[in-house]
């Protein structure tokens, strides 16, 4: 199993726009961090935990060519805003299973309604299979 930390920054990323904080002004490459996401490769499977607004860049930089499923930890934009960027994976692999608590799935349906439409769905819209995570474990 291999685990790749694609992003370990804050909800705004690092550096923060307009910030004078020393870390934000640092020239050290370790102080340039994208928003949180993890890519796990296990045998022939590939999973992503959270896909925020930096998801596209993270996939291109990491060389990830396949994602079998996405797990969303919670509904904040810095963990979910990259949902639209799963389309290239849909084109190659079809529907993407997404795992999340029910409140997260409901939030995604509100924010990305076009993804979940069943009638007159926009051609090329992401295709997902929501799978609810329950707390009974």
Where in the sequence are the language-model features?
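Binuclear metal-dependent hydrolase catalytic cores
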Residues: 1-137
């Amino acid at each position: 199993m291999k685990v790749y930390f694609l992003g370990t920054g804050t909800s705004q990323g690092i550096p923060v726009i307009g910030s004078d904080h020393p870390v934000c002004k640092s020239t050290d490459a370790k102080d340039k961090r994208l928003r949180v996401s993890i890519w796990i490769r296990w045998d022939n499977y590939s999973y992503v935990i959270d896909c925020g607004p930096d998801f596209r860049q993270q996939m291109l930089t990491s060389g990830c060519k396949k994602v079998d499923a996405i797990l969303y930890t919670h509904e904040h934009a810095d963990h979910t805003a990259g949902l639209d960027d799963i389309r290239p994976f849909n084109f190659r692999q079809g529907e993407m299973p997404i795992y999340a608590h029910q409140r997260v799935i409901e939030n995604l349906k509100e924010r990305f309604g076009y993804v979940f439409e069943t009638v007159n769905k926009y051609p090329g819209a992401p295709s997902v299979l929501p799978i609810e995570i329950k707390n009974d474990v």
